[in-house]
Amino acid sequence: MGHTRRQGTSPSKCPYLNFFQLLVLAGLSHFCSGVIHVTKEVKEVATLSCGHNVSVEELAQTRIYWQKEKKMVLTMMSGDMNIWPEYKNRTIFDITNNLSIVILALRPSDEGTYECVVLKYEKDAFKREHLAEVTLSVKADFPTPSISDFEIPTSNIRRIICSTSGGFPEPHLSWLENGEELNAINTTVSQDPETELYAVSSKLDFNMTTNHSFMCLIKYGHLRVNQTFNWNTTKQEHFPDNLLPSWAITLISVNGIFVICCLTYCFAPRCRERRRNERLRRESVRPV
């Protein structure tokens, strides 16, 4: 009896086809690796290069487009430049430096992929002469978060709050203890409409009768920042409530009052006699 072949394991009829496919994939990988990546901080200056040169004489026959995700940034047609409103007064076109654009005072919204397209007039038509892509990453580092704590009245529960602000991109906050993620009470993330920067805060309740070590971890993009909060219980003797029954407390109180009365009765005559002797002594020494 012959062996049956499992489906999907038939040998290739044309091994050269697989080799050709590998060559195509390698070529695509090489092409994709040509994308330029630029990373800058908020409010910094970013220079995005088109990687192509055009002489002054060729400008009249050349069209240059800079766009971000299909939205126009800048155009140069027949030597006339036009900058779109979002980039006006903060974008410079550097023709002599590989047709680069220079974006001033970076905003978080400037992040994205930019395309530079160069068209040249040839044989009664504009044909594409060059295409380049530049990926711009804009970041703002979050400061080390702060953790404040306060006690909730009439309970053994304590609450801690972790917060930080002024970072980008959008953060994700989590609480960890011994490597395990905990459930927070309330986590809020907000973005300033003007600066486009984020703020984040979160609350966590815990039982203050046991020791704890919490980590507040904030991830944003490929970066992270964290703060640790340690709680150590104080070693105190805890006496049970109502150590003595009420009748015993009453008996002790009555006995205490009785002892005080006895002491007063015993010492009162001595005090009176001492005062009487003092009075007689003063009278005996009084001059006639």
Swiss-Prot record:
Residues 145-230 form the Ig-like C2-type domain. The modification Phosphoserine is found at residue 284. It comes from the Eukaryota. It is a single-pass type I membrane protein. InterPro entries: CD80_C2-set, CD80_IgC, CD80_IgV, Ig-like_dom, Ig-like_dom_sf, Ig-like_fold, Ig_sub, Ig_V-set. Residues 35-242 are extracellular. Residues 35-135 form the Ig-like V-type domain. One of its GO terms (molecular function) is virus receptor activity. One of its GO terms (cellular component) is plasma membrane. It is found in: Cell membrane. Glycans are attached at residues 53, 89, 98, 186, 207, 211, 226, 232. Expressed on activated B-cells, macrophages and dendritic cells. A lipid is attached at residues 261-262, 266, 271 (S-palmitoyl cysteine). Keywords: Cell membrane, Disulfide bond, Glycoprotein, Host cell receptor for virus entry, Host-virus interaction, Immunoglobulin domain, Lipoprotein, Membrane, Palmitate, Phosphoprotein, Receptor, Signal, Transmembrane, Transmembrane helix. Residues 1-34 form the signal peptide. GO terms for biological process: cell surface receptor signaling pathway; cellular response to lipopolysaccharide; immune response; intracellular signal transduction; negative regulation of T cell mediated immunity; negative regulation of T cell proliferation; positive regulation of DNA-templated transcription; positive regulation of granulocyte macrophage colony-stimulating factor production. Homodimer. Interacts with CTLA4; this interaction inhibits T-cell activation. Interacts with PDL1/CD274; this interaction blocks PDL1/PDCD1 binding and thus PDL1/CD274 inhibitory function. Interacts with CD28. (Microbial infection) Interacts with adenovirus subgroup B fiber proteins. This is T-lymphocyte activation antigen CD80. The lineage of its organism: Eukaryota, Metazoa, Chordata, Craniata, Vertebrata.
